Amino acid sequence: MQFTSISNSLTSTAAIGLSFTTSTTTTATFTTNTTTTITSGFTVNQNQLLSRGFENLVPYTSTVSVVATPVMTYGHLEGLINEWNLELEDQEKYFLLQATQVNAWDHTLIENGEMIRILHGEVNKVKLDQKRLEQELDFILSQQQELEFLLTYLEESTRDQSGLHYLQDADEEHVEISTRSAEF
C-alpha cells in the first residue's frame, strides 16, 4: 500500500519587502523509509533593502528520515505463530520435566518427614527411658549408701561386742585355768 505525496507550500510577504518561504514535501510508503526535505529561507526585496547590505536569500535546509513499520503478510504472521507454538511446546516440556522433579522431591520430603516424625517419637521414648533409669540408679545409689552406713554401724557394733565377748571368754578361761590350778 502506498500513500500519495503531500506537498505544502507557505509564502508570506511583509510590507517592508521581507518574505518568508517554507516548502515541505512528504512522501510516505508503508514498506519503505520516508525522507522529508524542508527548505526554509528569507527573501528580501532588493529594491528596498539593497542599501543596507542584505543578500538576496538566506536558505536553510534540513533532512529528516522517518522509519515506517514494515507490512506483515499472512504467511509471515503464520510463520511467527508456528515459531511461538514450537517455543511454547518446548517450554511446556521443560515445565513438565521440572514439575515431575518437584513432585519427586515433594514425595521424598514427605517420606523423610514421616521418618523424622517416627524418629522424634522414638527419641522422646528413649529420653523418658533414660530419665526413668537415672531415677532408678539414683534410688539404688541411695539404698547402697544407706546399706553401707548400716553395715559400718553393724561392723562397729560387732567389734565392740566381739571385744567384750572376747574379754568375757578370756576371763572365763582365766577363771577356769585358775580353778584348775587351785585344784591341783
Swiss-Prot record:
One of the GO BP terms on file: protein transport
Gene3D superfamilies: 1.20.5.170
Coiled coil regions in record: 117-151
GO molecular function, one term: structural constituent of nuclear pore
Database matches in PANTHER family: NUCLEAR PORE GLYCOPROTEIN P62-RELATED, NUCLEOPORIN 62 C-TERMINAL LIKE
Similarity field: Belongs to the nucleoporin NSP1/NUP62 family.
Protein name: Nucleoporin-62 C-terminal-like protein
